[in-house]
UniProtKB/Swiss-Prot annotation:
It catalyses: (S)-2,3-epoxysqualene = taraxerol. This is Taraxerol synthase. The keyword Isomerase applies. Oxidosqualene cyclase that generates taraxerol, a triterpenoid product. Taraxerol is probably required to coat the leaf exterior as a defense compound against pathogens or herbivores. InterPro entries: SQ_cyclase_C (IPR032696), SQ_cyclase_N (IPR032697), Squalene_cyclase (IPR018333), Terpene_synthase_CS (IPR002365), Terpenoid_cyclase/PrenylTrfase (IPR008930). Belongs to the terpene cyclase/mutase family. The active site is at D504. CDD domains: SQCY_1. Signal peptide: none annotated. Expressed only in the epidermal cells on both sides of the leaf and not in internal leaf tissues.
Length: 779
């Protein structure tokens, strides 16, 4: 299958005139392999409808695609326009409030702030889904989607899961995010890497493009980049694994991933339960596939790719020699010598032993069975969503390898649509959806607007979604023996079916429920039962470390030296669980409010928690007064959270040096136009890097503005707040939206994440807090 892009034939164009993508909410269909704990609340899936859409609507979609393509090197993240167009039409939304502008030298009046805020509130309320959540794209890494295509190709399900229109949109996404040098970055804003260039290249070829095909000669340009940068022998370890699975690399060219890891005794420091959950979940199916030395069908395409991806005959590659090779463009975390020594020991001495009789029967077979037991457990406890997209594809493939016709694999196939998102830049794979995360902040932003009477229905639906999305049970059975922590009372990043507790998602969910409990039930619905709030508190208290900080998923505490064994080359801090400033600050704010409303419940434990957590935040401050943000870009994000947490804990500018230093950091980084703008490079470089040309970003501006409001900056000099608010107000678009700018999310120091909802949530919230907290003159 090959797609013509630049000039479609008239016949093809006529066939596609009536075609539209539609976002479906909270639907499970009649698939017998699909099930839910919560009637699919929060589920968001895209369907292609060949009959939908008027000529004007289809033209609007095509114009959005063309506009993205023409500006693809200037603004890399999508504006998430397809879902927005659909919802605004379904709600019959028309912005009836005229826009406002603040002229130079003009004061911001209360009326001006109110008008801008009301426009933002009405617009964003119209984007709410029927089940109460706010859908949004959550993607950005370019290694998410190709392995899914590769897995479906291997298993023979590519054309059923991804029919022609899906494949067209996948190719669109790949083409639209190719860098000018012909390669693809680790994420959409990143420099080209061997990992994502090779994966994207293989994906294009699987989807029917020839060696010289693709938009703008994409395939040939990608191949040239690969050959110019050392060929795929320089793939990082994850890439070598996927190439080995595809039959494009020999397993002997990969470092060992023995499944015997799952048989290790608990007293060892590298026992699975001591690993960070995502690290554990990635290497679980990887070790199964490695232990099996699984290789997919060697098709004519695979034989062609063997010729295209190397600069020497495939049979002549010295696999043993390329094991430690990695392109310099891919290296963020260089392996220490001790790690290479460990791999060499496993490769030379241990692995040959485990693959020979009698150990292949006595040990390897048992290890593979234990590994699959864990895979099935994790699959069942996430309703086959799994913990994330990287793990999803690997677990799905492992289930197929175990039994190609089995129910386990069919249940996995049924959940593939949960990961797919479509926007004007094409079809991509999400991390796993940010439904609860985005909705928690959206609700707080809307509540801060003090416009509840105008948006009561919106708030009631949001409240209902949050209540329904709380996890009601712990993982099944003896979950501790399966290396799992309690989850009852938590909120996940996405929806209840996902099942994985996250501390900051829990804190923000708890905060929403507590804020709603202060409001009339006839407006926002019945408040949550106290016992369920207590369960949430238990989760938060259980995740605090001795240093006062809060871990994200599971209790931290494994020895730090285990990070020396980080097997990836492009992530940092992935081996063990760590504490995070943002999680800690979120929990402080939630527990302070909980303590005020439920003063008798675990009072001493909560007070001890808050004291330790505040101290942790102070201890983590950087010399320049900032805090490093682990989940957003970067020091601006971390500082907003830290100042909010410290303020909630009773600290202020006068009694807390950390707040004074944090305030100075924000004031020192304000741009000339009144905003803030921080480059994503701050995250990997661990130092503040402004955007090029000192540009501002509205999301960063809102974070900084709210941080300064937390520190009560208005009591000292109100001008920086007015300047920031002016930029937010003047940047609002005609319909009440805000423009999409640079990427603002991150994970594991080096990989950026696009949160499409942030451009609405945070400018709205910033203006709301400004209007609420700052005395403004009346007109």
């Amino acid at each position: 299958m090959s797609f013509v892009w630049v000039e479609e034939s008239k016949e093809c164009s006529e066939q596609r005139k009536g075609s539209m993508w539609k976002l479906k909410i909270a639907q499970g269909g009649k698939d017998p392999y699909l099930y839910s704990t919560n009637n699919y609340v929060g589920r968001q899936t895209w369907e292609f409808d060949p009959e939908a859409g008027t000529p004007e609507e289809r033209a609007e979609v095509e114009a959005a695609r063309l506009n993205f393509y023409n500006n693809r090197y200037r603004v890399k993240p999508s504006a998430d326009l397809l879902y927005r167009m659909q919802f605004l039409k379904e709600k019959n939304f028309k912005q009836t409030i005229p826009p406002v502008k603040v002229e130079d030298g003009e004061e911001i009046t209360y009326e001006t702030a109110t008008t801008a805020l009301k426009r933002a509130v009405h617009f964003y309320s119209a984007l709410q889904a029927s089940d109460g959540h706010w859908p949004a794209e959550n993607s950005g890494p370019l290694f998410f989607l190709p392995p899914l295509v590769m897995c479906l190709y291997i298993t023979g399900h590519l054309n059923t899961v991804f029919p022609a229109e899906h494949q067209r949109e996948i190719l669109r996404y790949i083409y639209y995010h190719q860098n000018e040098d012909g390669g693809w970055g680790l994420h959409i804003e990143g420099h080209s890497t061997m990992f994502c260039t090779a994966l994207s290249y293989i994906c294009m070829r699987i989807l029917g493009e020839g060696p010289d095909g693709g938009l703008d000669n994409a395939v040939a340009r990608g191949r040239k980049w690969i050959l110019d940068h050392g060929t795929v022998t320089a793939m990082p370890s994850w890439g070598k694994t996927w190439l080995s699975i595809m039959g494009l690399f020999d397993w002997s060219g990969s470092n060992p991933m023995p499944p015997e890891f799952w048989l290790l005794p608990s007293f060892l420091p590298m026992y699975p339960a001591k690993m960070w959950c995502y690290c554990r979940m990635v290497y679980m199916p990887m070790s199964y596939l490695y232990g099996k030395r699984f290789v997919g069908p060697i098709t004519p395409l695979i034989l062609q790719l063997r010729e295209e991806l190397y600069d020497q005959p495939y049979e002549q590659v010295n696999w043993k020699q390329v094991r430690h090779e990695c392109a310099k463009e891919d290296i963020y975390y260089p392996h220490p010598k001790i790690q290479d020594l460990l791999w060499d020991t496993l490769y030379i001495a241990i692995e040959p032993l485990l693959t020979r009789w009698p150990f292949n029967k006595l040990v390897r077979e048992r290890a593979l069975q234990r590994t699959m037991k864990h895979i099935h457990y994790e699959d069942e406890n996430s309703r086959y969503i799994t913990i994330g997209c990287v793990e999803k594809v690997l677990c799905m493939l492992a289930c197929w390898v175990e039994d190609p016709n089995g129910d386990y694999f069919k249940k996995h196939l049924a959940r593939v649509p949960d990961y797919i998102w479509v926007a004007e830049d094409g079809m991509k794979m999400q991390s796993f959806g940010s439904q609860q995360w985005d909705t928690g902040f959206a609700i707080q932003a809307l509540l801060a607007s003090n416009m509840s009477d105008e948006i009561g229905e919106t708030l009631a639906k949001g409240h209902d979604f949050v209540k329904k999305s709380q996890v009601k049970d712990n993982p099944s059975g003896d979950f501790k023996s399966m290396h799992r922590h309690i989850s009852k009372g938590s909120w996940t990043f996405s929806d209840q079916d996902h099942g994985w507790q996250v501390s900051d998602c829990t804190a923000e969910g708890l905060k929403c429920c507590l804020l709603f409990s202060l409001m009339p039930p006839e407006l926002v619905g019945e408040k949550m039962e106290p016992e369920r709030l207590y369960d949430s508190v238990n989760i938060l208290l259980s995740l605090q470390s001795k240093n006062g900080g809060l871990a994200a998923w599971e209790p931290a505490g494994a020895p730090e030296w285990l990070e020396l064994l980080n097997p990836t080359e492009f992530f940092a801090d992935i081996v063990i669980e760590h504490e995070y400033v943002e999680c800690t600050a979120s929990a402080i704010q939630a527990l302070v409010l909980f303590k005020k409303l439920y003063p008798g419940h675990r009072k001493k434990d909560i007070e001890t928690f808050i004291k330790g957590a505040a101290q942790y935040i102070e201890d983590r401050q950087m010399p320049d007064g900032s805090w490093y943000g682990s989940w957003g870009v970067c020091f601006t994000y971390g500082t907003w959270f830290a100042l909010g947490g410290l303020a909630a804990a009773g600290k202020n500018y006068d009694n807390c040096a950390a707040i004074r230093k944090g305030t100075e950091f924000l004031l020192n980084t304000q741009c000339e136009n009144g905003g803030w703008g921080e480059s994503y490079r701050s995250c990997p470089e661990k130092r503040y890097v402004p955007l090029e040309e000192n540009k501002s970003n509205l999301v960063h501006t809102a974070w900084a503005l709210m941080g300064l409001i937390h520190s009560r900056q208005a009591e000292r000099d109100i001008t920086p707040l007015h300047r920031a608010a002016k930029l937010l107000i003047n940047s609002q678009l005609e319909n009440g939206d805000f423009p999409q700018q640079e990427i603002t999310g991150v994970f594991m120091k080096n990989c950026m994440q696009h949160y499409a909802a942030y451009r609405n949530i945070y400018p709205l919230w910033g203006i709301a807090e400004y209007r609420k907290q700052i005395p403004l003159p009346l007109r």
